[in-house]
Amino acid sequence: VRKHNGSKEMIAAALLHDVVEDTDVTIDEIRQEFGNAVANLVDDLTDVSKPADGNRATRKAMDRDHTAQASAAAMVIKAADLINNTESITEHDPKFAKVYLKEKRALLDVMFKIKHMDIWKEADSQL
């Protein structure tokens, strides 16, 4: 995110983007601690699906729809995360990478607000 001239709020949100999904921390707690701008970005970045919502394809479609409504700043962070995760998963779990890369291609395709940006092109080149 820093490489692509992200703001301090974007960098903070990039560091916090999995906190709500992976811990008991809430968006409201992030808002209290880091302010509205960071909390809104983290909210845009947090997957909305839950295991009870259906199979993986159904959940990923829900999360894609959520991402499609996100701000351009959140999409930049999401693209940076996609780049980082793609490198790691391709190297460490080639079998899962086949599924993962298809999901991320579909995700990147809904991130039209940043399609003109270098970070989108970098993510696109990895898929």
What function would you assign to each model-found segment?
Residues 1-127:
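Active-site helical microenvironments for divalent-metal-assisted chemistry
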